[in-house]
């Protein structure tokens, strides 16, 4: 069975480009998917001495490297309606929940900053900050923290107190400070909804609704236990 090139798909696979790349690299490294010989030539670096082993991961066609039972319908049924989760895998399950949650926070942060014309490159500091916030707050609550921090940064710029870069760089610190105040004072932060411009990714939906079977709680509850 073939998997079409990612660049030809309209599917939002994960919340961020970094997580999508990580997902593909893991599937390739574990040989769950392998490059199809029917992939288009421009999917490879044809001038490389390692051709055809050097390729563009989003341009090639893949083959599912799975052992198919006689009744393939059973396999597809298992994939679409999985029973993967068990208490012995709770730590791994929680770790993936956190990764998806951090990615959704980064996605919303970058969206809000772009909306007000700020340029910002999320890095390790941003990732770690959201990891810490998720110990106490859900993604839906962190949406609100982000919205407030970006609004405050935009105000600083519009009042000509900071330039765009300086204003954008205040956002991470503002998120941290507001979250700490909320925690120390026991504030019940408002839970925001997902927005139409950022629909839930396929990975997020499948993991929360099919694997963990917690539905929207993956968005509205902090990822502290499964």
Name each model-derived stretch.
Residues 1-226:
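Basic, alpha-helical nucleic-acid-binding regions used in initiation and control of genome expression
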């Amino acid at each position: 069975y073939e998997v079409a090139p990612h660049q030809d798909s309209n599917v939002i696979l994960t919340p961020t480009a970094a997580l999508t790349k990580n997902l593909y690299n893991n599937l390739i490294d574990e040989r769950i998917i392998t490059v199809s010989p029917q992939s288009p030539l421009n999917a490879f670096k044809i001038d490389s001495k390692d051709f055809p082993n050097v390729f563009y991961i989003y341009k090639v066609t893949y083959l599912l490297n799975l052992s198919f039972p006689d009744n393939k319908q059973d396999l597809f049924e298992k994939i679409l309606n999985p029973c993967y989760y068990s208490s012995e895998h709770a730590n791994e399950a929680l770790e993936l929940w956190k990764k998806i949650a951090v990615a959704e926070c980064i996605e919303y942060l970058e969206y809000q900053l772009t909306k007000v014309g700020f340029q910002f490159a999320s890095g390790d500091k941003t990732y770690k900050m959201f990891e810490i916030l998720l110990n106490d707050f859900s993604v839906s609550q962190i949406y609100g923290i982000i919205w407030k921090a970006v609004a405050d940064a935009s105000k600083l710029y519009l009042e000509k107190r900071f330039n765009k870069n300086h204003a954008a760089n205040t956002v991470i610190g503002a998120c941290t400070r507001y979250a700490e105040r909320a925690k120390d004072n026991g504030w019940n932060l408002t839970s925001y909804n997902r927005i139409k411009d950022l629909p839930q990714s396929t990975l997020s939906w499948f993991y929360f609704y099919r694997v963990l079977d917690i539905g929207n709680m993956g968005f509205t509850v902090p990822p502290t236990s499964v």
